[in-house]
Amino acid sequence: MKDHPQRWPHRPPHLFIPNTMYMVTASTIYKQHFFKAADRLVLCCEALLEVTAAYGWELQAWAAFSNHYHFIAQSPEDASTLKPMIQRLHSQTARAVNRLDGVSGRQVWFQYWDTCLRTDQSYYARLNYVHNNAVKHRLVQAAEQYPYCSAGWFTSNADIALREQVKAATPHSTEPHDDFTPAEG
């Protein structure tokens, strides 16, 4: 093939847009349940809150599970910090669970997927999705009952108009990557 390009991109380029909402999903390697215990889920949540703040990303919603997590955050002016932020989060949490398990150098995280949310409807639908993910996975009957996500805070503190918009949001045509089955606690 004479016209075949020398470099064929295997993934589309990432959009790094300042002050824009992103949804991120990450999976553990082979969907292993490294974060099954409550103390490990707390560790994951605390690291997520700490690392996103350190990089200037403003969390809007988050949910952590035994083998994956989702979050929505507004990017800072330099949205290209997404990759180093995720690398730091994964490195920090992997070292912590490896230390708890008495192993070193074990790979914990597989990869992550990010989506730039460019419409209000997409944002509301994804907020709904993240907050209700524990219900989707049948870990709780009501999202507010799951302690490792922001749904309880959102229900208690978000403006009522926003809560109603999110509640009414229909699932986006392209659901987030989520074929995980978390371990029951």
Protein language model annotation of sequence segments:
Residues 1-185:
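Short catalytic/metal-binding and nucleic-acid-binding patches
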